[in-house]
Amino acid sequence: MSQQTSTQVRKLVIGIVLLAAILMIVYVPFQSFKMVNPILGYQLERIEQFKVEENPSWPLLTLTTWLVSFFYPFWGTMSVLAGIALLAIAKALYDGKVWARGLSLFCLAIPSMGGAYMIVPWMNFVGSKEGGFPPAVLIMTVGLIPYFAVLLAEKGDLKQKVVDFLVFLMLGVTAAENFANGHAAFRILYGHPKRPIFAEGIAITYFGWLGL
């Protein structure tokens, strides 16, 4: 936001940001931890099922349990730090400081990305068994609503705002998917049973050493 933005709009946006910051501190980390055990329970169940069925892909699931148990709390803790940062820069954001706008968008992107990542393991393991609404959607929403409130609060052309919304939305989707794909690539490359021998079919490139 800039000083050209009306006082009423700035107060509204700051209110949304402060509410999000509080939720990032008191809600997001605990909800992130709460999702871990249900996912791990069904992951371990599927691993045992694959072993009984002699499914050769079971080793690729073994690292998934460790990755989920690390990255869910990791994103929760990062959200806490981002929430504290938002509280610290709220006055500067209200005053229209350019650096505060960029930093606030960065902080709000953390629960947005983390929540988007958390949706997939939940749906694959818990949702496929129990159904229901993924709690990670709420985590993602905590970041997304204030993110776009800050981004679109400036006075400007409606068409430009639509473009900004779509571009930044796709940037967020790309960032979250890149993290999720890196998560999957890691467990596949490091989980194959013949490691450190390169698994059959893995392309040898300049970065092939990353698969060892």
Enumerate the predicted regions with their spans.
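Topology signature of small-to-medium multi-pass alpha-helical membrane proteins
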Residues: 2-212
